[in-house]
Amino acid sequence: MKNSLTFTPLFLAIAATIIPLAHAADAPPVEGFVEGSHLTINTRNYYMNRDRRDIHTDDSKEWGQGFIGTFESGYTQGTVGFGLDVNAMLGLKLDGGGGTDGSSILPYGSGNGKAPGSFSTAGGTLKLRAFDTELKAGDLFLNNPVIAGGMTRMLPQTFRGVSLTNHSFDGWMFEGGQASFTKLYNQSGHRRIGTSYGTLPANTDSQHLDWAGVSFSGIEGLTSNLYASELKDVWHQYYYDLEYTYALNDLVSLTPGLHYYHTQDTGQSLLGDIDNNTYSLHFTVGVGNHSVTATYQRVNGNTPFDYITQGDSVYLDNSQQYSDFNGPNERSWKLKYAYDFAGLGVPGLTSAVSYISGKTDLTKVDPNSRGYSNWYSAEGKDAKHWERDIDLKYVVQGGKAKDLAIRLQWATNRGSNGYSAVDRDVDEYRVIVDYPINVF
């Protein structure tokens, strides 16, 4: 019998941090467990109205108030320091009557169209720091290109698992970990990690997601990331990005960049065959407080570009407020204009307007695909859709209301030639008010 050694993303991450540890200098002075502790409470008021224009059903209209309390301790003194983080979250329904649930900011109702009045969760994380390496175990807030918690609703998404990060070298960050469960942003309990667009067979789950990655920012204006992940028995997913900002002078800058994902089925292939290469290219011209960005995005493969359920791990330029423009073999273009009103004497006020157009052939999707058959459309030979997004945000700069943020978002999405098999014709409005409170 031949034994084989598999270099999983978690193994590679641990190996990558062992070498820096061996050469690390003396640990820098740190504050103690109590002295380095702090508590913050973020209040988030969230209203969403999703007006479905192509079907005769009630709109999804919900309004809620969220509270996120986060306590982070310092570390005990010594070469190896120990600490503890604790979080508690509460979501309250302010409005969401019969037939208007389903906006996704509140838990879904039990068939009566009414969301529950409240939902809550709490969790903790044990942490250990030695030199420039930090190990965490418990409930994690993750944010990287292959596993990122959704932050676009009233409460954040979290994961239960283990993570490891290292900052031994200037400009470099190494990380890795394993997550087995997730707390979705509109739920109280934990569940196994699924995917946003795939349908797993009944009574089956992926047991965990492993990841490893490295980030580089050691050259002024240049950033790059390389990540690998495995969603057990579903896929291997790899990611690379590169972006460089070149300042022509004090007023004008040029920023080209790219994002690339490769996704391949693995193990039991619970979602069926996957062989997907997706990339996006962008070029931004900044002139003072103005910027204009043009992007091109392409999905190569007869399955959509997919990522974890409710997550934000879709680091593609054309992922928008409503649609990700990630259909099988989809090509899309975007033009975006942004303005910072500090140029008119109103610091803290920013705006952006985007228009995106995409098209694909949904008849190429396998109607018998184990996980993605719902993407097949016999009328989708020349499927098209477009989206227009308007985003306005103001952050109070001083006084007692300092850091209070008000954000208005409006998305319009329209499809034709069979694309409604996936995305609906929708007008979506969001009003979000954040107020962070630093208790100590």
Predicted regions located by residue number:
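Beta-barrel outer-membrane channel/assembly domains of diderm bacteria
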Residues: A15-T17, L21-L142, I390-Q397, A405-F440
